[in-house]
Amino acid sequence: MARRRAGGQRWGFEQTLYGNENHIAGTPSLPHLKALLVDAAVRGHAVALGDCSGAFYQAPLTEENIFLEPPPEAGVESGFVWEALCAFPGLKGAPKAWEEHSAKELEKLGLDRGRYDGCLFVRFADNVKAGRHADDFMTTGPAQQLDQLMADLGEKLKLRDVVKLYRPGDEGTFLSMRVRRIEGGFTIKGKDSMVDDILQDLGLEDAKATIVPETKVETKSKDDEQKLEASDQLKYRRCVGKLLQLAPHRADIQHGIGVLSRGMANPTLRDQQRLKKMARYLIGTRDVELALVPGTPSDEVVQVYVDADWSDKKEDRRSTSGGILLYHGCVVASWSRRQACLALSSAESELYALGSGAVEALGFATMLGEWREQVVPTLYSDSSSALHVVKKRGPGRMKHIELRCLALQQWREEKRLLFGKVGTDENVSDMLTKPMPKERLIKLASMVGLRGGPYS
């Protein structure tokens, strides 16, 4: 079969609109990929990145009797068709076929596939680990064993363009992030081209930088209702889409990006003004990167800090939850989310934030368990009222959220989670719930490992 980039539909190959479960291929969680880097830093292991050439064409077909009309330039006599002998781009089952094929080859090399995250693999004999995102691989382990694994993957899966991060200064690209090895760990940074594209779309190439990404106080005006022109709406959505790719590594802008995302359906002039302020902030912080440098060994391997801003928006009075998950002192996950339910008190909104943090912590601990690393995460909140609800028995006066209260209480009683109090000034998740003044933002961002620009 000829190898062409064009999808099968252009060759007269028809598929049903909706597939089935055999067409769904998984991708690894970004926090789990960051955990691979942190684990390598803790153990002093090497890291290698690479991608497989012609991945889909390597996978055997999961369906039978797939035929295609040859393209006109092939010069095939009319009435003849091609029979597909392998998967190909455009075939719905191709991603799943490649996923299973690559997993089987990795298992032949002695790597066990994770059950919680099927895109992670580990070989306990020499502590070699691998994460696979489609045809891209991130692998860690002792240098000698990792070299052998790269050679084996090159032979079995045609792994190419291998970049080795063995010494400080080595760097490579994985997905849309630049990974660089430094003394004691790694740094992660989004592509600079994304910032350049945003500034170009908004006509801000020569603009001056702002010191904060968003303004806390906004006076109500007609700009709140004035819709953008169709062309400006398209630019708005394109810019916010690029910001969303930068967000996982930039906790300092996640809250602002969340606010911008709410205007995606019908962006207004006010939304555009917010976007331009965010873009000007990126001018002065384009060099900021997230450092993954493990701290001093501690019993608290996994820590989660959560916070909430109660009823912060007058439009719907829904609160905002923020959280940061640390693994060996390194930020592997952070989030800023609108709460789905209205909270009747600040304690209730903080309880919702604890619930979100608990789910993230338990999921991450489950993944670590498959690495034979048994941990009990610790959740920190600055709300004494919410922590009191968790530490007592029964919902008390909060009968309307009984299940949430009882779940947190049960996880604490089963010692699956620990809970602790943190001072408001030291709660790093505070910047994920509301706009911050300059000094406060610099302090919190520096505490979570952001480096470069205004951050130490």
Functional labels for PLM-detected ranges:
Residues M1-S456:
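Long, low-complexity, charge-biased intrinsically disordered regions
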